[in-house]
Amino acid sequence: AIYLKNKEKIFTIGNSKAVNNNNTITASNLNYDKIKNIYEAKKNVVVNDYEKDTTIYADEITYFKNEEKIFTSGNSKAVNENNTITANILEYDKIDNIFKAKKNAVANDSEKDSTIYADEITYFKNEEKIFTKGKTKALIKNKYKFNSENVSYYRNLGDLISQKRSSVEDDSGNTYKLESFVYNINKEMLRGKDVDVFAKVNENKIDQYFFSEGFFDFKNQSHIAKETKIKIHKNVFENEMLK
């Protein structure tokens, strides 16, 4: 280690570790500015926050100890309880317990078996809320695919919500295009407005339905809808006549 006494700065190279309060930082290289109370770590960085039960991994981190904020760059990951967030860039506000992930952001909820992909993700850990910014994809229980933008996810309720034009694909190959939606992960229930449903009959045939509002029970494969318009694939009546 190198200690510049006049500047109150410490530089370390190789297998470095900083321990303070309920946090530890390990990395190949560590710099500490004692006056500003700022840590900079590079290469194989791991931050353990024992108070919040959170571990952060990254290529580089800057830890502003006075403000209790961490900024990461490159191959960033935050892990706590049943959740994992990965991105190129992470910001962690320890006091408010808020994570912000930018660029190729992914939030995985292993308990709910759901993964959200977005340009930007903000996770309010205390309230168990996630808000995305920009184009957003979600994969629920490895069965239901969502394409939307500016999505809200209320983890305790199991609600995935968007007021933007969206599409949903179920595990039977049916596609739902909606002006807005609320999906409950626990009940596997989709509610949407101005819904176009493309129901897959087989590989070459699709029935199309329009509902001004619809409630779709994926688990029991049933629905309740208002103002229904039906466009049936052209071979339906031909097949009936041949019977």
Please name every model-derived segment.
Residues 1-243:
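Structural signature for solvent-exposed beta-strand/loop edge elements and short helix-capping sites
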